[in-house]
UniProtKB/Swiss-Prot annotation:
Calcium-selective channel required to prevent calcium stores from overfilling. Component of the multi-pass translocon (MPT) complex that mediates insertion of multi-pass membrane proteins into the lipid bilayer of membranes. Residues 123-132 dip into the membrane without crossing it. GO terms for molecular function: calcium channel activity. InterPro entries: EMC3/TMCO1, TMCO1. GO terms for biological process: endoplasmic reticulum calcium ion homeostasis. It is a multi-pass membrane protein. Homodimer and homotetramer. Component of the multi-pass translocon (MPT) complex. This is Calcium load-activated calcium channel homolog. It comes from Dictyostelium discoideum. The gene is tmco1. Its main location: endoplasmic reticulum. The lineage of its organism: Eukaryota, Amoebozoa, Evosea, Eumycetozoa, Dictyostelia.
Length: 186
């Protein structure tokens, strides 16, 4: 019985990820606004990479000053374009979030207090609350639906986005903690 429950949770996770990506495609990815924004980000990123490569090859101080200004201008445009693209995705994310919360609530009622599987390890402290949620007892190798659903949904949704080509653009601006190239070399 436990194997069927795990397979059911996996199936629901895959189906919900596909459905959420379908909703995202309908509301966002097929629109001209999104396609223009993504093309603009790609174009700006190529320009920025080209300028950074040229700057590293340039030795003249006056040329570097001009290039620095151009780089700053393009980085600012890239930041604005990323912001606009994120804003256009907002309605889709809202619809997906509501549907995922409803689905999770439904699954939580079905599997309330049910041990779905046994883990071959004891999860570290902060994961025990997720892996042992709604399960009575102190055996932390017992696993609830919440843990399996959360892990599968995160993994499956990211992979579906990669397969469908709807993953967020990978820009240097995406990591707010990344150091600029100048500061890394010092």
């Amino acid at each position: 019985m436990a194997a069927l429950e795990v397979l059911f949770i996996l199936f629901v996770s895959i189906a919900s990820s596909l459905a959420s990506e379908g909703v995202s495609w309908l509301l966002v990815y097929r629109t001209e606004n999104y396609k223009r924004g993504k093309a603009n980000i790609d174009r700006l990123q190529i320009q920025l990479d080209k300028l950074v490569d040229q700057e590293s090859e340039t030795s003249s101080l006056s040329k570097k000053g001009n290039k620095d200004k151009k780089i700053e201008k393009i980085e600012e445009q890239l930041k604005i374009a990323n912001k606009e693209l994120s804003f256009s995705k907002m309605k889709s994310m809202f619809a997906v979030a509501i549907s995922m919360i409803a689905l999770f609530s439904y699954l939580n009622r079905i599997f309330d207090g049910v041990v779905v599987c046994k883990l071959p390890f004891v999860p570290i402290g902060f994961l025990q609350g997720i892996s042992h949620r709604t399960i009575a007892g102190d055996d932390y190798t017992d696993c609830s639906m919440t843990f399996i659903y959360a892990i599968c949904s995160m993994f499956i949704r990211n992979n579906i986005q990669l397969i469908l080509g709807t993953a967020p653009p990978k820009t240097k601006q995406a990591n707010p903690w990344a150091l600029p190239e100048e500061k890394k070399t010092r």
